[in-house]
From Swiss-Prot:
Modified residues annotated as Phosphoserine in this record: 299
Summary of the function given for this chain in its UniProt record: Neutrophil serine protease inhibitor that plays an essential role in the regulation of the innate immune response, inflammation and cellular homeostasis. Acts primarily to protect the cell from proteases released in the cytoplasm during stress or infection. These proteases are important in killing microbes but when released from granules, these potent enzymes also destroy host proteins and contribute to mortality. Regulates the activity of the neutrophil proteases elastase, cathepsin G, proteinase-3, chymase, chymotrypsin, and kallikrein-3. May be cleaved leading to a loss of its anti-protease activity and to the appearance of an endonuclease activity. However no catalytic site was identified.
Site (Reactive bond): 343-344
Source organism phylogeny: Eukaryota, Metazoa, Chordata, Craniata, Vertebrata
Gene3D superfamilies in the record: Alpha-1-antitrypsin, domain 1, Antithrombin, subunit I, domain 2
Superkingdom of source: Eukaryota
GO terms classed as biological process: negative regulation of interleukin-1 beta production
Record protein name field: Leukocyte elastase inhibitor
Region described as CARD-binding motif (CBM): spans on this chain: 350-378
Length: 378
């Protein structure tokens, strides 16, 4: 499992960097895990150069038995009885007159639980689009009502692969609503806006990265299988969001080092965190091409593992993600024992998230990053 989670994290950070290049100061929110899952389904049907480019970009070339590992990971993440709701759903929507190889359909069904729904793109592409959106809306509890905008599919569309992920978790330690106050949030050195700032003082895993002058806070969700981890610089030092330096150093190795339990200490922390809600949409063709996935989106695509016809390529990889963080906990969706100590001399730390920060929601047992974002403006 470790190999796969390392590959998924490397890809998550590469994609974050690619999105950052085209949007250096705005909000970013994605579910890298959802995107990796959807691309892994496509990978099942790729051959030749197309397969090599995708494997390399997703860092799957370092992982043995990639698909069976995904299968166990999906089962682990979707496990019932967990104290949070986390739903991962995959589906293929195929043109009903087009012949897909039975082996491909059997593999996606077995490994990713993805059924093929036959739709009529050829004669009724608008109805097909609505059916796909309706399915995603249902899987994400209404949070993503329109994954595919009008015109994204047409009569030439053969296949749409959809991955939807939905998460709702309550904080292990909730914020009291009455402690929430209006407070300024600094967007950069010059500008600020008023936000609803939540507050609580409890013991949390806390760390400090000296060379980056950055605080690390882990806020566990009930059950502790999932946590939100926040990287907050002490101040805004650059001319943008203040996150440049951290973003330049974001690698799998660094991230593991900064956030591993041995490097975090359970301390009393005064946590000030804004309530926020992000809804972001991405066309991932350009960022993926930047990461080396080039043949998939055009006539050079080799998808002969999906169909014998040579005319199949992936026209678009669309991703939408939603997150809401409040006093109770977090709701997010995307498509693609403390020991009591005398409290006399407990050192206290302040964690005042009143300027931009990077955050991610991690599945702790597998170390997979399910959601990753930058909050520049709540």
């Amino acid at each position: 499992m470790e190999q796969l989670s390392a590959a998924n994290t490397r890809f998550a950070l590469d994609l974050f960097r690619a999105l950052n290049e085209s949007n250096p100061a705005g909000n970013i929110f994605i579910s890298p895990f959802s995107i990796s899952s959807a691309l892994a389904m496509i990978l099942l049907g790729t051959r030749g150069n197309t397969e090599a480019q995708m494997s390399k970009a997703l860092h799957f070339d370092t992982v043995k038995d990639i698909h069976s590992r995904f299968q166990s990971l999906n089962a682990d993440i979707n496990k019932c009885g967990a104290s949070y709701i986390l739903k991962l759903a995959n589906r293929l929507f195929g043109e009903k007159t087009y012949h897909f190889l039975p082996e491909f359909l059997a593999s996606t069904q077995k490994t990713y639980g993805a059924e093929l729904a036959s739709v009529d793109f050829l004669r009724a592409s608008e109805e097909a689009r609505k059916a796909i959106n309706e399915w995603v809306k249902e899987q994400t509890e209404g949070k993503i009502p329109e994954l595919l905008a009008s015109g994204v599919v047409d009569s030439a569309t053969k296949l749409v692969l959809v991955n939807a992920i939905y998460f709702k978790g309550s904080w292990q330690e909730k914020f009291m609503t009455e402690a929430t106050k209006d407070a300024p949030f600094r967007l950069n050195k010059k500008d600020s806006k008023t936000v609803k700032m939540m507050y609580q003082k409890k013991k949390f895993p806390f760390g400090y990265i000296k060379e980056l002058k950055c605080r690390v806070l882990e806020l566990p969700y009930q059950g502790k299988d999932l946590s939100m981890v926040i990287l907050l610089p002490d101040s805004i030092e650059d001319e943008s969001t203040g996150l440049r330096k951290i973003e330049q150093h974001l690698t799998l190795e660094k991230l593991n080092e900064w956030t591993k339990p041995d490097n975090l200490e359970l301390l009393e922390v005064n946590v000030h965190l804004p309530r926020f809600r992000l809804e972001e949409s991405y066309d991932l063709n350009a960022p993926l091409a930047r990461l080396g996935v080039q043949d998939l989106f055009g006539s050079r695509a080799d998808l002969t593992g999906m169909s014998e016809a040579r005319d199949l390529f992936i026209s678009k990889v669309v991703h939408k993600a939603f997150v809401e963080v409040n006093e109770e906990g977090t709701e997010a969706a995307a498509a693609t024992a403390g020991i009591a100590v005398f409290a006399m001399l407990m050192p206290e730390e302040d964690f005042i998230a009143d300027h931009p920060f990077i955050f991610f929601i991690r599945h702790n047992p597998s170390s997979n990053i399910l959601f990753l974002g930058r909050l520049s403006s709540p």
